UniProtKB/Swiss-Prot annotation:
Disulfide bonds: 3-21, 14-42, 27-31, 46-57, 58-63
Organism: Dendroaspis polylepis polylepis
Pfam families: Toxin_cobra-type
Name listed for the protein in its UniProt record: Alpha-elapitoxin-Dpp2a
Subcellular location: Secreted
Chief place of localization: secreted
Keywords assigned by UniProt, alphabetized: Acetylcholine receptor inhibiting toxin, Disulfide bond, Ion channel impairing toxin, Neurotoxin, Postsynaptic neurotoxin, Secreted, Toxin
Gene3D superfamilies in alphabetical order: CD59
Taxonomic path: Eukaryota, Metazoa, Chordata, Craniata, Vertebrata
Domain of life where this protein originates: Eukaryota
């Protein structure tokens, strides 16, 4: 499986056993100025999240695309 990774402009091959791609988003103290924080990566199962955190999981190559906004 290949998934997009945080801080990379190219998808990466996931480690053996990690066949799920995920996109996790949440707000921090800078959310109103910078937008939501984003984490992209691979996992063996869809990660569990806390309140206020959104996660999307998928199981095809490079399915964890995220449209980053333009800096202000």
């Amino acid at each position: 499986r290949t998934c997009n990774k945080t801080f990379s402009d190219q998808s990466k091959i996931c480690p053996p056993g990690e066949n799920i791609c995920y996109t996790k988003t949440w707000c921090d103290a800078w959310c109103s100025q910078r937008g939501k924080r984003v984490e992209l990566g691979c996992a063996a199962t869809c990660p569990k999240v806390k309140a206020g955190v959104e996660i999307k999981c998928c199981s095809t190559d490079d399915c964890d695309k995220f449209q980053f906004g333009k800096p202000r």
